[in-house]
Structure formats: structure tokens, C-alpha cells
């Protein structure tokens, strides 16, 4: 590999894939990233231990062959806890109420999400009934699933006429706190709080009718803003669909 290519390769590696190791106050080296990835595969396929070790020694560490870079980034506990992290991209038409919760779950897992708000999809959504007069406290857990559940509970309250959730953010770690499982730093509760407020505002304005494509698009954008605030990848939107079918 030429020097210019090596420099570019190292920049991408240490910026996107190397975990910070608090005990020694530095990021992983390329060889350590490969060892973490190989160890995950060996735990999954112990009968192939020696073959995996040899492949990484002869091909992966010298960068002759590269595995899925998503698996290199999240190798270990993140993928073993939720294998959705190994996916690079996904697609989700907004044709059912829980699509919004699925989108935030995928985005927080590092998966790119393309979505469609074409009228033929959005027409499948139910009429927004609005929540009942009864409130209930919902404690948001400090996890990807916790954030996704908060969105799901809010949408369900408005589409199924359930009790109005009063969100409790006390368990979400403060901004800047270390994320142990996946690495990086926590965004704090504010991005999610803002997102839920924006979603609630749109839902309130559409009680008694179905959401329109532009409203669904706005909701997806508010969700992706919350995820971006945490330094995770964003949603994408197909340029050919910029003119929304908001009939």
C-alpha cells in the first residue's frame, strides 16, 4: 500500500472503527481491532478457531481481505447483544404505526435507514385518535431499546387511543458520559426529549385524520436529528421523491 493510501486508511480506521480503551487511555490499533473481530467469530464458531486465527493473520491484518466493516466497528458485545448492528443499510416504508420506532432503533444501532413516505404507503396508517385524558408515567431506559420504546409508546397512545405517556428521563446518562458497550459518548436526554416533543406536536395537529406524507417525513427527520445528536448515522431520502405526494 502506498504511503498516501496508508495515511488515508489509518485516518478512517482510527476515526470510525477504533474503540477507545480507557484503561490505557488510547484507541485500538488496527491489529487490536482485528483481534476483537476474530474473537467474536471464534466465540460464535469455536470449531473453526484455528482456521479463523490463520485467516486473520494471513489476510485480514495485512489488509489483503477485509470483513464487513460494520462487523469490525461493532465486533464483540454490541453485535452479540443485537445482531442488527452488523447490517450496513436498511429500508422502511412508513406504512404502519411502529415504523417510526423501528427507524430510531435501526439508526441508533448504526444502520443506515432509507424510508418512503409515498402516499400509497402512508395511506395504510390509522387515523390519529389522540390519547385518553388519563396520564401514565413512562420511565425511559438508558438503551437503544429504551429510546425506541419511548417513540413506540407515544405513537401507540395517539393511534390506539391509549393513556398519554408522561416521559421520565432520569435514567438516561448525562451528555458526555462514556458508552460502555458500543463506545463513544452519550448525547444526554435532551435530543430525545426534543424529538418526542416534536412528534407529539405533529400528532396533536393531526387528531381526527391520518398523517400526511409531509408529516411522516417531518417525523422521520426529527427522529434522525435526535440520533445525529449522538454522533450516529443519519437517515437518507431519495432525491427523486423530493416532491412529496401530499394529496
Give a label for each model feature.
Residues 1-247:
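Extended catalytic cores of very large enzyme megasubunits
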Amino acid at each position: 500500500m502506498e504511503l498516501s493510501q496508508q495515511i488515508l486508511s489509518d485516518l478512517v480506521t482510527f476515526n470510525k472503527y477504533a474503540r477507545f480503551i480507557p484503561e490505557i487511555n488510547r484507541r485500538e490499533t488496527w491489529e487490536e481491532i482485528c483481534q476483537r473481530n476474530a474473537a467474536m467469530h471464534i466465540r460464535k464458531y469455536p470449531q473453526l478457531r484455528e482456521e479463523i486465527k490463520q485467516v486473520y493473520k494471513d489476510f485480514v491484518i495485512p489488509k489483503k481481505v477485509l470483513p464487513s466493516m460494520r462487523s469490525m466497528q461493532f465486533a464483540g458485545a454490541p453485535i452479540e447483544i443485537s445482531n442488527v448492528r452488523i447490517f450496513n443499510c436498511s429500508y422502511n416504508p412508513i406504512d404502519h404505526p411502529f415504523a417510526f420506532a423501528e427507524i430510531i432503533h435501526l439508526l441508533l444501532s448504526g444502520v443506515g435507514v432509507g424510508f418512503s413516505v409515498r402516499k400509497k404507503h402512508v395511506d395504510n396508517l390509522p387515523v390519529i385518535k389522540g390519547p385518553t385524558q388519563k396520564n401514565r408515567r413512562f420511565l425511559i431506559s438508558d438503551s437503544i431499546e429504551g429510546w425506541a420504546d419511548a417513540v413506540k409508546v407515544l405513537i401507540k397512545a395517539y393511534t390506539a387511543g391509549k393513556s398519554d405517556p408522561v416521559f421520565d428521563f432520569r435514567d438516561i446518562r448525562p451528555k458526555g458520559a462514556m458508552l460502555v458497550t458500543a463506545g463513544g459518548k452519550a448525547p444526554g436526554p435532551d435530543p430525545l426529549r426534543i424529538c418526542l416533543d416534536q412528534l407529539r406536536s405533529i400528532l396533536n395537529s393531526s387528531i381526527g385524520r391520518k398523517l400526511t406524507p409531509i408529516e411522516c417525513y417531518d417525523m422521520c427527520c426529527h427522529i434522525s436529528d435526535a440520533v445525529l445528536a449522538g454522533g450516529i448515522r443519519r437517515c437518507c431520502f431519495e432525491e427523486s421523491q423530493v416532491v412529496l405526494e401530499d394529496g
